[in-house]
């Protein structure tokens, strides 16, 4: 498994050798610094902690700075842990760049969806409006009946309702990498990824076998 931290730059399009337009999301991937290395002997599993994006020291707490100073790493805004196949080969202070992936790799991209604030059931869950005529009632954007009265005298869990919409962790699986620019630390993946421009994303090797989504392609039983 390979992984890297990045930021969503935006969407664009690339033409393949047949002139077909491929919608892609451009991600600024890395460079990331190995901040901590976890081993089976000490922690019970193999993993590395990556740090991404330099920030001023004054923006971190003393415990955070102590953790980074112990590793001899400059202040980082984001720290994330990954279970990597080559964790034993990496050492604290090593740099992970976009070229850890190559064109044709399949990845899972995790991000935070856009926030939409407090929304009603129609926008949040796609509920149907009540009739606007023929006795449709005084309100037309409510959820309608939520269940019985005396029995069970409560609303079952899972019923839709108004509330905060968005700002959820979302993972899009089996996106293939169309292009990698190692000099600019940019990765272009086919399709859309969660979050706004500038949003933090985690790119990891896909964990599932899959069927390639686009046309004129075969089936991959072991993508990595």
Predicted regions and their residues:
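Extended basic (Lys/Arg/His-rich) segments that typically form rRNA-contacting surfaces
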Residues: 1-224
């Amino acid at each position: 498994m390979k992984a890297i931290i990045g930021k969503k730059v935006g969407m664009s399009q690339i033409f393949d050798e047949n002139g077909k337009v491929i919608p892609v999301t451009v991600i600024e991937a890395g460079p990331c610094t190995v901040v901590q290395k976890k081993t089976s002997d000490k922690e019970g599993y193999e993993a590395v902690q990556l740090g991404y994006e330099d920030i001023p020291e004054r923006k971190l707490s003393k415990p955070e700075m102590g953790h980074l100073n112990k590793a001899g790493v400059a202040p980082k805004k984001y720290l994330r842990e990954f279970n990597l196949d080559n964790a034993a080969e990496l050492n604290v202070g090593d740099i992970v760049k976009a070229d850890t992936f190559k064109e044709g790799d399949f990845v899972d991209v995790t991000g935070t969806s856009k926030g939409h604030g407090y929304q009603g059931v129609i926008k949040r869950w796609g509920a149907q409006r009540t009739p606007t005529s023929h006795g449709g009632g005084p309100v037309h954007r409510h959820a309608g009946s939520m269940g019985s009265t005396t029995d069970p005298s409560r609303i079952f869990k899972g019923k839709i309702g108004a509330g905060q919409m968005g700002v959820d962790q979302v993972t899009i699986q089996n996106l293939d990498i169309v292009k990698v620019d190692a000099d600019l630390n940019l990765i272009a993946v086919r399709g859309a990824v969660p979050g706004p421009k500038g949003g933090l994303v985690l790119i990891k090797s896909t964990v599932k076998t899959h069927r390639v989504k686009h046309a004129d392609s075969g089936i991959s039983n072991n993508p990595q």
